[in-house]
From Swiss-Prot:
Keywords: Cell projection, Ciliopathy, Cilium, Cilium biogenesis/degradation, Disease variant, Joubert syndrome. The gene is FAM149B1. Belongs to the FAM149 family. Residues 48-67, 563-582 have a biased composition (Polar residues). Residues 28-47 have a biased composition (Basic and acidic residues). It is linked to Joubert syndrome 36: A form of Joubert syndrome, a disorder presenting with cerebellar ataxia, oculomotor apraxia, hypotonia, neonatal breathing abnormalities and psychomotor delay. Neuroradiologically, it is characterized by cerebellar vermian hypoplasia/aplasia, thickened and reoriented superior cerebellar peduncles, and an abnormally large interpeduncular fossa, giving the appearance of a molar tooth on transaxial slices (molar tooth sign). Additional variable features include retinal dystrophy, renal disease, liver fibrosis, and polydactyly. JBTS36 inheritance is autosomal recessive. One of its GO terms (cellular component) is cilium. It comes from Homo sapiens. Residues 16-67, 413-438, 485-512, 545-582 are annotated as: Disordered. Involved in the localization of proteins to the cilium and cilium assembly. Indirectly regulates the signaling functions of the cilium, being required for normal SHH/smoothened signaling and proper development. It is found in: Cell projection, Cilium. Interacts with TBC1D32; may play a role in cilium assembly. GO terms for biological process: cilium assembly; protein localization to cilium. This is Primary cilium assembly protein FAM149B1. It comes from the Eukaryota.
Length: 582
């Protein structure tokens, strides 16, 4: 019950309206002023009597049930409720809002009854025509029900024994059973182990505590069986330290441990069963597609191979019919081209498909003599020392190919000699050549000036005048006998004029300086006609040599310059040699 509008006579300026009795008990209004005119006093009496009559009329409509509480509309208008001076006294704002809400709710209820049930009330007389227009324009649907509002405390008390159940509670239960309203009622629980300790610490009345204990074991209505599983993920701390436990944890996860809920387990079982059956069908369908796709792919590959094979075969046939002719290149690039034949194949543009490998023959280019001289000269310079015996011997015989022979152990030169051996064609020896013959490539290298011979060298039995462009004297019989003991590697030469000699001075640095050699065993295979090693006596048949650019002492010399004179005598006489030092 709400008792309202109990008024006390106050002056006109301090008139309070709409304040409840409960608020006035706690907060009494200000005292009455001493100076009050009789006219105002009589006016206050009339106002108070009118407000009392309004309150009596209004109290007949109010009830304890907030849902059915109805208040008369004329009571608000006739009483002239205002809040002009209530801004300073805001004790009853909540109750005023509640009254306004109830008023609005009553108006909507009356309108709904007029729309859907055609019940006419006092409040909806003015809205009758409008509601008829609304119903005529389109149909209306109304859903009736009772709103369940959860109390703010979080729990509600229910009696345990049937005898203690009140009549109002039985009526509400009967209404809920008859109607289609779905309502959930229960008690709010806290999922914590310390709830009992917290509840005991709270100051409660004894009756409330006893009633709560009774409610914990009470069963209101039981319909079916409810099973609830609480699942949680627990991570073991020792999994990071022990690998076995981590493996066990993965196995448990595969098996579905920990259990989640029966519905989830059933769902997993059904999905596994359905997946097996569906996967078999999918595999059978995909097998046909895969086979057809693979057959088409294989057929495409075979066609591509069949197309590419004639092209490659035709290219090979063309290359065999028309041998590859190498273009003329500078002499300094001969070895580079021959060492990389694949670049020539790619540059020839005869092969249409780059991915195929074409192997064909390649004609050999003539040996570049000047480049070979440089390579051998560099090799000998690296390996020779003052006492070494490595030398390059070049023999300038007429109408005879120049031959190279070296005892160098260089792997590069020997490997090239093995791969590409030079031609060993021997030409007939001819001694009838004029001295004014055009000098050859080696003669251009062996240019020099005449060196005066020492006086003691002129005491030989048959002094021979030295000339510049004469041929070397033939090999004597004594030398032939000496050479025969060496082996079949030396070649016999006929006797010629024994009064010829040569003398030269080295002018070009490219010429290899002669040094005495040591007979080494033949480690590398070569033809018998190769003159790789010369005897010391044959080597000393050369004329006096002077080294103006670089002085390298030979065996038995004591100075930086070496002056030697060699004289050859006919008739197989031994060769004499003299040396002079500074």
């Amino acid at each position: 019950m709400i008792s309202r509008y109990t008024r006390k006579a106050v002056p006109q300026s301090l008139e309070l309206k709409g304040i409840t009795k409960h608020a006035l008990n706690h907060h009494p209004p200000p005292e009455k002023l001493e100076e009050i005119s009789p006219t105002s006093d009589s006016h206050e009496k009339d106002t108070s009597s009118q407000s009392k009559s309004d309150i009596t009329r209004e109290s007949s409509f109010t009830s304890a049930d907030t849902g059915n509480s109805l208040s008369a509309f004329p009571s608000y208008t006739g009483a002239g409720i205002s809040t002009e001076g209530s801004s300073d006294f805001s004790w009853g704002y909540g109750e005023l809002d509640q009254n306004a809400t109830e008023k609005v709710q009553t108006m909507f209820t009356a309108i709904d009854e007029l729309l859907y049930e055609q019940k006419l009330s006092v409040h909806t007389k003015s809205l009758q025509e409008e509601c008829q227009q609304w119903t005529a324009s389109f149909p209306h649907l109304r859903i009736l029900g009772r709103q369940i509002i959860t109390p703010s405390e979080g729990y509600r008390l229910y009696p345990r024994s049937p005898s203690a159940v009140s009549a109002s509670y039985e009526t509400t239960l009967s209404q809920e059973r008859d109607s289609t309203i779905f309502g959930i009622r229960g008690k709010k629980l806290h999922f914590s182990s310390s709830y009992a300790h917290k509840a005991s610490s709270i100051a409660k009345s004894s009756s409330f505590c006893s009633m709560e204990r009774d409610e914990e074991d009470s069963i209101i209505v039981s319909e079916g069986i409810i099973e609830e599983y609480l699942a949680f993920d627990h991570i073991d701390i020792e999994e990071g330290f022990h690998g076995k436990k981590s493996e066990a944890a993965t196995e448990k996860q595969k098996l579905g441990y920990p259990p989640i809920a029966p519905f989830y387990c059933m769902k997993e079982d059904v999905l596994a069963y359905v997946f097996d059956s569906v996967w078999c069908k999918v595999v059978s369908c995909m097998e046909q597609l895969t086979r057809s796709h693979w057959e088409g792919f294989a057929s495409d590959d075979e066609s591509n191979v069949a197309v590419t094979r004639p092209d490659s075969e035709s290219s090979c046939v063309l290359s065999e019919l028309h041998p590859l002719v190498l273009p003329r290149v500078p002499q300094s690039k001969v070895l580079y081209i021959t060492s990389n034949p694949m670049s020539l194949c790619q540059a020839s543009r005869h092969q249409p498909n780059v991915n195929d490998l074409l192997v064909h023959g390649m004609p050999l280019q003539p040996r570049n003599l000047s480049l070979m001289d440089k390579l051998l000269d560099l090799d000998d310079k690296l390996l020779m020392r003052p006492g070494s015996s490595t030398i390059l011997s070049t023999r300038n015989w007429p109408n005879r190919a120049v031959e190279f022979s070296t005892s160098s152990l260089s792997y590069t030169v020997q490997s090239t000699r093995r791969r590409n051996p030079p031609p060993r064609t021997l030409h007939p020896i001819s001694t009838s050549h004029s001295c004014a013959e055009t000098p050859r490539s080696v003669e251009e290298i062996l240019r020099g000036a005449r060196v005066p011979v020492a006086p003691d060298s002129l005491s030989s039995p048959s002094p021979t005048p030295l000339s510049r462009n004469n041929l070397l004297p033939p090999i004597g019989t004594a030398e032939v006998e000496h050479v025969s003991t060496v082996g079949p590697q030396r070649q016999m030469k006929p006797h010629g004029d024994s009064s010829r000699a040569q003398s030269a001075v080295v002018d070009e640095p490219n010429y290899q300086q002669p040094q005495e050699r040591l007979l080494l065993p033949d480690f590398f295979p070569r033809p018998n006609t190769t003159q790789s090693f010369l005897l010391d006596t044959q080597y000393r048949r050369s004329c006096a040599v002077e080294y103006p650019h670089q002085a390298r002492p030979g065996r038995g010399s004591a100075g930086p310059q070496l002056h030697g004179s060699t004289k050859s005598q006919s008739g197989g006489r031994p060769v004499s040699r003299t040396r002079q030092g500074p």
